[in-house]
């Protein structure tokens, strides 16, 4: 009898959750667009007169970093500017890039590593949860790995939360995905 009640309560809980509207907050970088931007940047670097003999290169390392290398700091800054222009044209947000220190390489050449931020770090996720709670919105916010899920019975609450987060500077590009309504 008690097991049947617990099972029925579990079914009711699932039904109640199914009536909630929800969306996920993510921060992803489209790696294919990054590759395309790197290819375009390399093409422009090869064609530019001031960078022709600079031995500049841009490489994608795995799915989480870009390696820049050039003959000097001036050339590296020019390469970085070209890459940033191409990334913006391809729709990749510069907020998701973290620049490493300039490192000396062989001879006079220098290199720099740029990390791509994939997912929402835990401290940023906690900040998002705190923002929603402080706004006194009737919504449940949960951290699921590198994603934050927001659910509420009222769609207008979810729209207000999206507007609140878009209006805030979080230090990384947020995307709102998996919007589910009933």
Predicted regions and their residues:
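Short, surface-exposed ligand-recognition loops at beta-strand->loop->(often short) alpha-helix junctions
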Residues: 28-37, 116-122
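Positively charged, low-complexity, intrinsically disordered RNA-binding extensions
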Residues: 18-19, 23, 111-182
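Short amphipathic beta-strand starts and helix->beta connectors
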Residues: 49-56, 94-100, 125-137
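Short glycine/threonine-rich beta-strand-turn micro-motifs
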Residues: 61-73, 144-154
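A generic structural signal for short beta-strands and their flanking turns/coil linkers
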Residues: 21, 54-56, 62-64, 95, ...
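Helix-adjacent hinge/juxtasegments
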Residues: 75-113
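Short, Lys/Arg-enriched N-terminal segments with co-localized hydrophobic residues
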Residues: 1-16
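Short Lys/Arg-rich amphipathic alpha-helical segments
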Residues: 28, 32-35, 43, 47-55, ...
């Amino acid at each position: 009898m008690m097991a049947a009640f617990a099972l029925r309560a579990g079914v009711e809980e699932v039904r109640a959750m199914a009536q909630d509207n929800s969306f996920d907050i993510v921060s992803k970088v489209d790696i294919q667009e990054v590759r395309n931007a790197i290819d375009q940047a390399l093409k422009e670097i090869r064609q530019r007169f001031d960078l022709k003999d600079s031995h500049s290169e841009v490489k994608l390392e795995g799915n989480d970093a870009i390696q820049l290398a050039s003959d000097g700091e001036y050339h590296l800054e020019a390469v970085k500017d070209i890459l940033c222009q191409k990334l913006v044209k391809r729709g990749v947000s510069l907020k998701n890039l973290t620049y490493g220190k300039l490192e000396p390489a062989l001879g006079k050449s220098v290199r720099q590593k740029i990390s791509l931020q994939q997912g929402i770090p835990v401290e940023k996720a906690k900040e998002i949860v705190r923002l929603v709670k402080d706004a006194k919105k009737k919504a449940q916010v949960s951290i699921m790995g590198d994603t934050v899920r927001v659910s509420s019975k009222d769609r207008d609450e979810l729209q207000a939360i999206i507007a609140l987060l878009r209006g805030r500077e979080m230090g990384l590009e947020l995307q709102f995905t998996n919007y589910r309504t009933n």
